[in-house]
Amino acid sequence: MSGNRQQRRKRQKYFRIAALLLCLAVLAFSVWLLFIPNQLNHRKGNPTLHNNAGTAGTESAAGMEQNADAQGFLAVLEGSTAQLPAADGSWNSSDTSVAEVDSSGTVTGVQQGRCQITDGKTNYQIAVRHLEQRQEGTYADGILIVNKSYPLSADYDPGLQPITKDAFQKLSDAAAQEGLDLYIGSDYRDYAYQVKIYNNYCNLYGSEQADSFSARPGYSEHQTGLTIDCNTIDDAFGETAEAVWLAEHCADYGFIIRFPDGKENITGYQYEPWHIRYVGVDTAKEIMSQGLTLEEYLGVQSEYAGPWEG
């Protein structure tokens, strides 16, 4: 009899363990169901809020016109044109070997450099940028540009670059001294991982809608190893003290807010207060102090050339 009781106790013990494991599995699956859709919905914010700035274009980015920034800064690529506003007087370039301007205010980039263009009342600082195609991607004046017009090669796999990691650590330490908590929510993603993310969005929302808030594989800045998403990837982050501090101080450590508010039609993406890109201190300060996007600073476009064929 004692042997039978021991066997029953063992069976009861096994049943209890099995029941506990089953409960844990159900709980884990429930958490997964709650967490994964939430992450998808917040990866680029609410997709219904995005502008369709990334709709396909047929003209090459280098041939498209740029418009002058309200701060009196204008960047244009070599061999491309940009448009200044109507002038009361005639336009003049301080260095026609760098940039030329006609009577209508159309600026043509001649060669890499800087000059001033004025109508006698308003001065514009003109930067003519040089594009260089390297194996991994495209550089404008030595800055790696990745957006809807300029992809990276699929095999480019730098990981989170040390200069980015070190700069963010300094930024995070400085924020901590102010009682704030800034940490890495997401950083480097390789091409294959971006395929999964983009396909998930396409399955949920369709490719046209996905293009308005998610980068296609090869077109994601996260593949550069120069980009970090801070804290939670959620619109609510923009209302936090950390987000305010980040916008005010990120340039001191070489970062810019990559997709600033109100510039959706230029960057192709909704405002992302958590998304920062390392460009170096001097460049970051110039961009942030003038309220520019990286596209405006480099004189490039951000538009897909056609539908996704992946």
PLM region spans:
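Well-ordered beta-strand positions in beta-sheet-rich domains
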Residues: 73, 98, 106, 123-125
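Extracellular/lumenal glycan-associated surfaces
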Residues: 88, 114-122
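Short, exposed beta-strand/loop patches in secreted or surface proteins that constitute
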Residues: 98-101, 108, 136-137
